[in-house]
Design a protein with these regions (language model features):
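Conserved helicase C-terminal RecA-like lobe
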Residues: 3-13, 21, 25, 29-229
Length: 229
């Protein structure tokens, strides 16, 4: 993750070999969807990703109704949701779940306004329910996902806006940075670029130049292997 940040700052193309980059991971995309909604309620892609993640009883029929209203009235999904709730145009259970989501985003946006970026992101993630959702996950990956969310908070605490971010809020500047990390800096497989990979993955590839990171006593080789006869 720290290598990715440094390469982005230096505008050096890179590729993560055999794995996902940090900002491509599902749990990070989930958290960013909430952050984008906090920054702007009318981000439709973020609305679709966050509205039922974690699951809160908002089904496909409800989302279809919101999409149809947004299409018919040329408005955002957020505005369509508000319109449908005011018009009582959906079943009570679905309406309650949808209103709970809208209220959550409004409350966390207003309640964190003016706070430091890292603190704001930490509170948004906590209120979203994502940490609890992944903590209770039974797929064996929940703890890793929670740790990635914690690393996202750490990344916002380290974040320093660039000169071109002048005029943007800290949150908007970070979201623009995240969008860049998720897109343009990812090199194609055969581009001239820095390749990030494990030592095991690098075996036999015959790169002309290789840097070994973490070559520290007790870490590489691992202390356990040093004890073997």
């Amino acid at each position: 993750r720290l290598f990715e940040e440094a390469l982005i700052q230096a505008q050096i193309p890179y590729r993560v070999y055999g794995g996902q980059r940090f900002f491509e991971r599902a749990e990070i995309k989930d958290a960013l969807a909430y952050l984008r909604l906090v920054a702007s309620r009318h981000e439709d892609a973020s609305f679709e990703r966050a509205v039922n993640q974690p699951p809160r009883g908002i089904g496909a029929k409800t989302i279809d109704a919101v999409r149809a209203h947004a299409r018919d009235f040329a408005c955002s999904l957020w505005q369509a949701s508000q319109d449908l709730l005011r018009g009582r145009a959906m079943p009570a259970r679905a309406a309650t779940a949808l209103k709970t989501f809208l209220d959550l985003v409004d409350e966390v946006a207003q309640g964190t306004e003016g706070t430091a970026l890292g603190d704001r992101v930490e509170q948004v993630i906590a209120r979203s329910g994502l940490v609890e959702h992944f903590t209770n996950s039974r797929d064996g990956k929940g703890q890793d996902r929670v740790e990635n969310l914690e690393e996202l908070v750490n990344a916002t605490r380290r974040f320093e806006p660039m000169p071109e971010d002048e005029g943007l809020s800290e949150l908007d500047a970070f979201l623009a940075h995240a969008a860049l990390e998720a897109g343009e800096q990812q090199a194609d497989a055969y581009d001239e670029a820095v390749q990030l990979m494990t030592l095991h993955s690098a075996k036999g590839l015959e790169f002309p130049l290789v840097f070994l990171a973490g070559l520290e006593e007790g870490l590489f080789p691992h202390s356990l292997s040093a004890e073997d006869p």
